[in-house]
Amino acid sequence: MNEQPENLRNFTINFGPQHPAAHGVLRLVLELDGEIVARVDPHIGLLHRGTEKLIEQKTYLQAIPYFDRLDYVAPMNQEHAFCLAAEKLLGIEVPRRGQLIRVLYCEIGRILSHLLNVTTQAMDVGALTPPLWGFEEREKLMVFYERASGSRMHAAFFRVGGVHQDLPQKLVDDIEAWCDPFLKVVDDLDRLLTANRIFKQRNVDIGVVPLKEAWEWGFSGVMVRGSGAAWDLRKSQPYECYAEMDFDIPIGKNGDCYDRYLIRMEEMRQSVRIMRQCIQKLNAPEGKGPVVVEDNKVAPPRRGEMKRSMEALIHHFKLYTEGVHVPAGEVYAAVEAPKGEFGVYLVADGTNKPYKCKIRAPGFAHLQAMDHICRGHLLADVSAILGSLDIVFGEVDR
């Protein structure tokens, strides 16, 4: 008697929202056929705060802290996109030293993000040592954030027209001294994970994304580079002073989780290269000077000036009560954030507040393909794939 039972149906389980491998407040509804994933249904919006609407009611200066709270793993990279958009509309050029400080801190943010991703990726598949080493380095980087802006995470350090304040020379020297020991830590992580048999079994040929599909789904950043395209906005559409920096773009060939891991490891080394060049340029005579534009309609005057000049005092008062009036127009500015292309589409109507600020978060496009990538994989592979997409919920839900 070998009749098939009639009522075979797939098993549905909840993954998250409080699952340790769910990276924040993700809820996945998984439809399983045995242990094979038949369907993935991501439920988002658990961290939605209406950021885009809130920005419409704030001046351009007050809008900056909202960007720290999107991808809160690498905050300054988001502020960068918003400031670039506003600067395009205002038609202002950031002073050289301001550009170098921005690039330096954006690369620190990239390392912060990749360290977290690579080490938690290892933790998701069962390795417990990498996160301990990685977080030790992240701690040092957060101290650099704190010494520049007073805050470890939500820095609000970038300004329209430059950065809030200059870096002390001691801080620049300390960042330079940090570079060499950090590369040794990356090598240690490399030795621990790259050739590790278990790590490879969990990541090689898992979550393969062919290049054609990566473009179709709107992927960017590591997700397209892992599939073999040398697409990096820092090279293809250089902004600030990236055009004069010498660095390489690592690309993968298989488009699987393992290639994406290798790319993030190599990108950390390239970021250190860029940081070294920034520090060298900051220490050179032409790297000295103002860090924010001298135009008092956009940036506040110096304290000493305000004590002497009534006009400077009025400028300061107007700037912080009313804010800067941005000429009407619309603009799209994108930066190569650690997760991918982070874009800001800004519509100004000539007032002191943005008319509309559309945020293009890279993680959103990556998460929407979760169903497509996971089908046919085992349940245990879901957390490995999710980790390699590098999703942070602040920017997905915004």
Curated annotation (Swiss-Prot):
The keyword Protein transport does not apply. One of its GO terms (cellular component) is plasma membrane. The keyword NAD applies. It is a peripheral membrane protein. Its EC number is 7.1.1.-. Signal peptide: none annotated. It is found in: Cell inner membrane. One of its GO terms (molecular function) is NADH:ubiquinone reductase (non-electrogenic) activity. Keywords: Cell inner membrane, Cell membrane, Membrane, NAD, Quinone, Translocase, Transport, Ubiquinone. PANTHER family: NADH DEHYDROGENASE [UBIQUINONE] IRON-SULFUR PROTEIN 2, MITOCHONDRIAL (PTHR11993:SF10), NADH-UBIQUINONE OXIDOREDUCTASE 49 KDA SUBUNIT (PTHR11993). NDH-1 is composed of 14 different subunits. Subunits NuoB, C, D, E, F, and G constitute the peripheral sector of the complex. NDH-1 shuttles electrons from NADH, via FMN and iron-sulfur (Fe-S) centers, to quinones in the respiratory chain. The immediate electron acceptor for the enzyme in this species is believed to be ubiquinone. Couples the redox reaction to proton translocation (for every two electrons transferred, four hydrogen ions are translocated across the cytoplasmic membrane), and thus conserves the redox energy in a proton gradient. Belongs to the complex I 49 kDa subunit family. This is NADH-quinone oxidoreductase subunit D. It comes from Bradyrhizobium diazoefficiens (strain JCM 10833 / BCRC 13528 / IAM 13628 / NBRC 14792 / USDA 110).
